[in-house]
């Protein structure tokens, strides 16, 4: 009798649907996946080790480069861990700004996810729509920090600076006439907060557009319904978090269960799935974008009414004002010490977790009392998700592997670290 031999296929790392540098070794029986073996490490940059040789504040930009689609949320986990060890209080206004930018980042992440996921499955229009909205949010990043992606905006003790009073405007060029320019700058005549408010006022209609294209689309449902099903029990056993866990019907959200900053004052709902398949995870993330709009609106309302400091006044941790440095010798010394030596963190260890767009992003920080971390451990949500890929893909077709990678919302910056 003829021997049945499985076929081995290398999927990636040069594959457009591999989301970066994923290499999957697929064992196939015809076109059915028997085993999926993810090979990682192609984007390993030793972030945890590099952080041990940098002062606490110098490692903030490294956080942006972990999950390079959800920049500020990575920073948030890191600064929370430092603040726990230092035992410092963050001004209320800074907390609201952080929550606002966490939600802006969540929308940025989910727009990238819905665009890339739809493109992988074969729907191109959504990708173009999503990037149209992302552009506005990238401009907000740029307005507050000077960078479109790697913002380094959060600081231990607060944020780098308050929201600017003026939103940068588009300038005239050869490709834009005055009419087009006026339309583009329509929402940019006020402050950054006005621009964010305007964006979140019109954004729900944009979400409706994506849903019109996908939610009841017959082809979209055929590609997602019943694919990559994870039961609630298995989701917990495999360490899934975020939309991957909520898609399986478990209402676990750190913003509700272990509130940090001012999330306990926010009024929002936690969407959960029923069937635990790719379609439910899609619905959960779309609803998350709608909830982010609610949270952002509440933050904007509070920020308008309550001006105030956005950085702690402890000059051992935060730089003094430039005005003070010109007249006060002590301020100048503090500034010099802070940017040469950094600040010393008391001996101890702390774990801080935030509800990252992809799941639970945790930072475990060990300090030996020096000006650098003794050990920094990053708990990346995508790592556990990728580990579950084999189980989710078994028995499905090769084309479904693409759908499953898309639904996991994998970014290799955080997985390989």
Curated annotation (Swiss-Prot):
Where is this gene product found? Cell inner membrane
The top EC class, named as a word, is: translocase
Topology in the lipid bilayer is annotated as: Peripheral membrane protein
Task: Name the reaction it catalyses.
Answer: a quinone + NADH + 5 H(+)(in) = a quinol + NAD(+) + 4 H(+)(out)
Any one annotated GO CC term: plasma membrane
Chief localization: membrane
Q: Which GO terms describe its molecular function?
A: NAD binding; NADH:ubiquinone reductase (non-electrogenic) activity; quinone binding
Q: Which UniProt keywords apply?
A: Cell inner membrane, Cell membrane, Membrane, NAD, Quinone, Translocase, Transport, Ubiquinone
Q: What is its EC number?
A: 7.1.1.-
Q: Which domain of life is it from?
A: Bacteria
Spell out the PANTHER family in the cross-references: NADH DEHYDROGENASE [UBIQUINONE] IRON-SULFUR PROTEIN 2, MITOCHONDRIAL, NADH-UBIQUINONE OXIDOREDUCTASE 49 KDA SUBUNIT
Query: What functional role does this protein have?
Result: NDH-1 shuttles electrons from NADH, via FMN and iron-sulfur (Fe-S) centers, to quinones in the respiratory chain. The immediate electron acceptor for the enzyme in this species is believed to be ubiquinone. Couples the redox reaction to proton translocation (for every two electrons transferred, four hydrogen ions are translocated across the cytoplasmic membrane), and thus conserves the redox energy in a proton gradient.
Q: Which family does it belong to?
A: Belongs to the complex I 49 kDa subunit family.
What does the subunit section of this Swiss-Prot or TrEMBL entry state?
A: NDH-1 is composed of 14 different subunits. Subunits NuoB, C, D, E, F, and G constitute the peripheral sector of the complex.
NCBIfam families, alphabetized: NuoD, PRK06075.1
Which protein are we looking at? NADH-quinone oxidoreductase subunit D
The protein's organism comes out as Burkholderia multivorans (strain ATCC 17616 / 249)
